[in-house]
Each structure stands twice: as structure tokens, then as C-alpha cells.
Curated annotation (Swiss-Prot):
The keyword Glycosyltransferase does not apply. Its EC number is 7.1.1.9. One of its GO terms (biological process) is ATP synthesis coupled electron transport. It is a multi-pass membrane protein. Keywords: Copper, Electron transport, Magnesium, Membrane, Metal-binding, Mitochondrion, Mitochondrion inner membrane, Phosphoprotein, Respiratory chain, Translocase, Transmembrane, Transmembrane helix, Transport. It is an enzyme of class 7 (translocase). Mg(2+) binds at E198. This is Cytochrome c oxidase subunit 2. InterPro entries: CcO_II (IPR045187), CcO_II-like_C (IPR002429), CcO_II_C (IPR034210), Copper_CuA (IPR001505), Cupredoxin (IPR008972), Cyt_c_oxidase_su2 (IPR014222), Cyt_c_oxidase_su2_TM_dom (IPR011759), Cyt_c_oxidase_su2_TM_sf (IPR036257). It catalyses: 4 Fe(II)-[cytochrome c] + O2 + 8 H(+)(in) = 4 Fe(III)-[cytochrome c] + 2 H2O + 4 H(+)(out). One of its GO terms (molecular function) is copper ion binding. It comes from Leggadina forresti (Forrest's mouse).
Amino acid sequence: MAYPFQLGLQDATSPIMEELMNFHDHTLMIVFLISSLVLYIISLMLTTKLTHTSTMDAQEVETIWTILPAAILILIALPSLRILYMMDEINNPVLTVKTMGHQWYWSYEYTDYEDLCFDSYMIPTNELKPGELRLLEVDNRVVLPMELPIRMLISSEDVLHSWAVPSLGLKTDAIPGRLNQATVTSNRPGLFYGQCSEICGSNHSFMPIVLEMVPLKYFENWSASMI
């Protein structure tokens, strides 16, 4: 999860987030190299007294500054497209959870079970227990098995919302009348926090998301106790 004054991304918990962090580093390095080159050229222009007043064209330079940007764009586009395909691909999910956004709470339905559904509201600050996080704790957590592919179906009952959990690399819009899907896979157990990431009204910032990833045995015991 995030901590105060954090400058980087949250620790990756899913394969998708690991790929996104690698892509971030890859793209950031390209941006750094381009920025360094531009600053170097600007410094040369400001410090050197040599000028070419008679130069009308330079075919070699024009060829380079046409081909080089195209090559850089390809280096960015190829890994980006690969990650996009990975995020859309869902192979044999073991569980499907339907998520509905409301003003201003989330409701969840485990579609593989006959009667396993609940609403998830933020716990008010005056009801928090010691050690709990302000504006992030909920009364009903989403319990899911770790290390298994899970499909999330996401929609909304009223206005636009967005279901986002940064450490899992997830951000999917909840649109009324439309079902979007996302894949959830966690590499380790724990609590993972997120929030609604689309302005949805006056209490937009009071729609936290808490995923509790547990081993499969614990998930089976939890689901049996909830039915």
C-alpha cells in the first residue's frame, strides 16, 4: 500500500503490475535519454560561436531525425501493446465477481455461488479501531483466493465510477448499462487498498476498496461461512 511522502509506485502484487512497472522504467529511461540529448544540444547552441549561415539543407540530418523518432516510438509501442493484450486476456478464471458502483459505496456478488453478495461501505473515522486506516477501511472486505485468475465484472447503478487497486495494476471504469471486465491475480496474501478513481459526486473520496487475498483453503472456509 501507499505510505506518506511516497514518490514511486506501490509494490507490485500481480504479474500485470510487475509488467507495468517494468514498462514505466523502460519508458522513463527513454524520456531521460531524450531530455539529456536536447539539453546537451541547447547548451551547445548557447555556448558555441560557430554558425552555418549558408547551410540550406542537410539530407543526412533530416534522415536521422525522421528515422530515430520512429524507432523510439516503436520501442515504446511494442511492449505497450503486449501489456494491453495481457490485461485483456482471461484464461479459465476460477471465480467471477460482479462489482457494482453506487453513490457512494460498492456492492459485490460472487456469481459462482447461489447467494453470496454484500455491500461495502467505508467505515467512518469515529468508528475506526486502532491500526485501521482513515478513509480506506470498509465494513465488508472482498475476500479472494491468491495465485488464481479471477474475473471481475464491473458496472454501475447510477453514474460513472472507476474501480481501481494500484498495487494490482487495476483501474476499470464502471459505466451504467455496460459490463467491463478485469483480471485479478495476486502473488501473495494480504490486504490491498484502492478507491473510486472517477469523480462521481460529493462523496467520491469516500468509496474505498479493500481486497483480502488469502490461500484457497481459507477462502473456501470464508465462503462457506457466508452462505
